[in-house]
Amino acid sequence: MRNVNWGSVTATADGGDFKRPAPGGYVARLVSLEDNDAKQYVEAVFDIAEGEFANYYSDDWGQSHPYAHHFFLSYKDTALGMLKGRLESIQASNPGFDPFAAWDAGRLDMFTNRLVGINLQEEEYEYNGEVKTRLNVCQVVPVQDVRDGKVKPRDTKKLDGGNAPSTAPAVVAAPATNVYAGPIPFN
């Protein structure tokens, strides 16, 4: 165990003054992009680049939990329109950068440190039978839309009825009726 200079540490209560970003628009910086060829998508990990929450995910927790601050660029045939829209948002946010040329050249490293606007939406999920919330990217936009206040928070994405945790048992057994009570015909 290491010695700590307690004189330089400010005490906080458990849960303390931890503040997380609210749903809505943020200017984000792309930290890394990784291709998953089998599933036909690129996972884009981001950090918030401007404002009160700049570098929010750059701490140890954020670096070890990239799934908490990422979005996908799917290149399945059915999602190419959305991919093009997201690449156009990256292009509008980074004058002089051609994300289409970088994409076609397979140079995902060229996206690192590029800016993009994102809209974070709160969504419900179930964990150990309890409903919790997390932030997820619901929209990728040009950074100027965020700066101009054009990006509005969306309502919380609720669990649908089929996924909501239930306190009732899944199957209720009916009482047995007309049960055979005679001798067992085989031994």
Where are these regions (language model features)?
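Short beta-rich binding modules
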Residues: 1-187
